[in-house]
Amino acid sequence: MNSRDSAASEITPEVLLRAYACGIFPMAESADDPSLFWVEPELRGVIPLDGFRVASRLARTVRSDAFTLTVNQAFKAVMDGCAAPQPGREDTWINRRIRELYGGLHAMGHCHSVECWQDGELVGGLYGVSLGRAFFGESMFHRARDASKVALVHLVARLIAGGFELLDTQYVTEHLKTFGAVEIPRRRYTVLLEKALTGPAANFARLPTDRPLAGAEALAIIAERG
């Protein structure tokens, strides 16, 4: 379903959460387009948490702790990084209204960022929405090789430790396929989403948020689940 919403100002963070619970999410045509439209893909991208794959070379990078990882320490800067053009991604769909809405979800504790630092500089990261035991990945960026990949590894470790059941990537790219992402039909996705929204909520802060998590620890958590 792609329905144009010409009155984006009527969407609130609360409305956004209800939309995620129904399996839909907003996008904009471009950063300069003030309007939003709702999206409900026929085929949905997910990464099974018990099937998350880390290539050997990336595992060595994660284990080396070449990057320092933090959580929810630079949410706005991560959104800025995701909205900026990158090689292979010259255009962005993150407009001002998207920034406002997800900033509101962050203030409510439903939107989180994972930051990747090198020598005190933010070089990569990602952000997404948590609801129940589901996490909806929104966007990621990198300014140094493997930075966003390392952020994803740490995110998955945090989701596993916190009791999450569903990692929704919305769409599947060749990049995400290397981590085990697959496409599933909307009907199957709806079943998984309903299950993830029933019962106790997961805890995104189950792992410490006040100190960096070692790469070896993140990999051990993932290996235990897999």
Swiss-Prot record:
Gene3D superfamilies per the UniProt record, alphabetical: Leucyl/phenylalanyl-tRNA-protein transferase, C-terminal domain, Leucyl/phenylalanyl-tRNA-protein transferase, N-terminal domain
Recorded superkingdom: Bacteria
One GO location term (cellular component): cytoplasm
Record keywords, A-Z: Acyltransferase, Cytoplasm, Transferase
Biological processes, Gene Ontology terms: protein catabolic process
Function: Functions in the N-end rule pathway of protein degradation where it conjugates Leu, Phe and, less efficiently, Met from aminoacyl-tRNAs to the N-termini of proteins containing an N-terminal arginine or lysine.
Name this polypeptide is given: Leucyl/phenylalanyl-tRNA--protein transferase
Organism whose genome encodes this protein: Bradyrhizobium sp. (strain ORS 278)
Primary gene name: aat
